Amino acid sequence: MATVQELKRRIRSVRNTRKITRAMELVAAAKLRRAEQRITALRPYAETMNELIAGVGRAASSVRLPLLEQRETVKAVAIVPLTGDRGLAGSFNAQVIRRAFAVERSLQAEGTTVRWVAVGKKGRSTLTFRRRELSGAYLGFTDQPAYENAQAIAHRVSELFTAGEVDRVVLVYNTYVSALTQRVTEQDILPISADILETDEEERAADTLRGDFIFEPEPEEILERLLPVYLETQIYRALLESTASEQGARMTAMRNASKNAGELIDTLTLRMNRARQAEITQEILEVVGGAEALM
């Protein structure tokens, strides 16, 4: 049975750990609020980008651009898992990596070659440990991603796609639902779906009322410049979703850790009180026994 002093040391240690987990919970909550604000701020830009591409696409007579090329035979696929640079976030990193490997198994069963582009230290370390060859690794920014980070990733995957090294690019990341819920998502980002160039009847009617636009340069050239920006925006949105998911998962994990620490402190305190009671009882018995021996 543990002594009173040993139990006191354990209680002190757990209390110190609880202070750390509470601090981490507060930091994660603050970062989560900022991430939510950035996601909200991006939405109008992303929606306008979609409208702009659709409008230019309607004006283009023919669209044959590398990023839109749908290849008949898919021989190689690049998987891009978005993970964090740090742990202590519950199952946040594990579920992305697990889904990415499930996608890999499915592709390999079809005879497709898989290439990897890692985002986040946790993903990179797991892929390296499993001896996967990386076609790119982007680290050190997952807490607060910048648009430049999305540009770098977009440039690399576009390079692989246009060079014919891969025929498809799949993004695997956590979509932010709430602080308690993160949903693993697979998204094909290359080739860009031609659906973004399609419009409904209302939009076509609105174009008719506005009349014909004069484009300078030609619509095809504008679209060629817009599509890479569209790809960057899609990746940036996924990075922001992943960041919010990570902070939500970390906040929840640290809250649970603090709760468990409190319960452990209560249990250890009860054990310490019982141990102290047993020591006092033993001392009383020894005193009484000594007094009886003298009588």
Enumerate the language-model features and the residues they cover.
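C-terminal beta-strand-loop-alpha-helix "lid" module of Rossmann-like NAD(P)-dependent dehydrogenases
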Residues: M1-M295
